[in-house]
Amino acid sequence: MSVGFITIDEHGDIYLDPDTPPVSNPNFIEEIHRNLRLTEKFGLLTEFHDEEYIVESFDHPLHIIAIEFKEKKIFLQTKQNTLFQADNSKWSVDEWDRFNGLTTSYSPFVLTEKAQAQLFNLADSYDDEGFVADNEYIATPPYYIDSPQIESPQYWVNVYQSEGNPGWNLNEAAEAFKDMLPRIKFPKSRILVLGCGEGHDAAFLARAGHLVTAVDFSKEALARGKEKYKDLTNLHFFESDIFQLPQDWNFSFDVVVEHTCFCAIPPDKRSDLVRLYRRMLHEEGQLLAVFFAMEKRSGPPFGSTEWEIRKRTEQGFHYLFWGRLRNSIPSRMGRELFVLAKKKKD
């Protein structure tokens, strides 16, 4: 089967082509919804008219507008009137107190405000940890699953040493940067690469003539990068926790690069990371980013939605470009979001 793309916007509307109106045929919607499934790489696929499609969903793909409790089961109705049953072991709540979860067919959903209000009205009781439906307690843990070990530099050293070539290490610059940098045509810039790993993105930018500072707190990754790219005199590797960068770096970079850092840190530090982007950039500075948009609660790498990424960045940045990449490497196809954004003035 050939592979195409289907887009689901922030309201849950489905598009076969972003330049045409959303799909309105109930049978088509039903088919697309029913065939939704998570891949092993935590992307989304569906089938429609015997063809397979990668699903690019701005938020969790199923937007639930109504719920029903019946015989210890919870039934969900999408805005297009497709009906699903919730997997009562897969509920969670995000940082913005939105309830979400998986259906019994393993499709991700999020409750609209209307549906969430209805849930509270129907529940026998509820507390900060969950709710009771038909005398059954349904836990709603935080969406992201805590992984405290990732805050230790030794954890990352161990991964590099045990795996040799960790899954995030492409041994080359990200396809997005190779594709987009010639189009953007930055003038010679001071660029900061956060969580640089072995420095492949940083080296690519340095070879394009920029003055690049690459930061990581894995000694192993930095040692590899320094050896591999020792010929680049305009590339400087710096060992540090990104949240402990020198104060005299503040407001001194033209561009901050994000690629596999946002997904690698504890998700409860993501807003701190966005503030760090802004702190490192001068008033006209820009964020050059590849984020992972995928349905993955554990990590690293932790997933995120475009909804979350926008929620965290919209107060601090003007978006110059925002879009999914369709020239990714196969293992990342449909899950990479390219963002170019300019720092908002205080």
Where are these regions (language model features)?
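Short catalytic micro-motifs in class I SAM-dependent methyltransferases
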Residues: 260, 264
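Terminal leader/tail segments of proteins
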Residues: 1-148
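Class I (Rossmann-like) S-adenosyl-L-methionine-dependent methyltransferase catalytic domain
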Residues: 148-249, 265-346
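Conserved acidic residues
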Residues: 254
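A conserved beta-strand element that flanks and buttresses the S-adenosyl-L-methionine
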Residues: 257
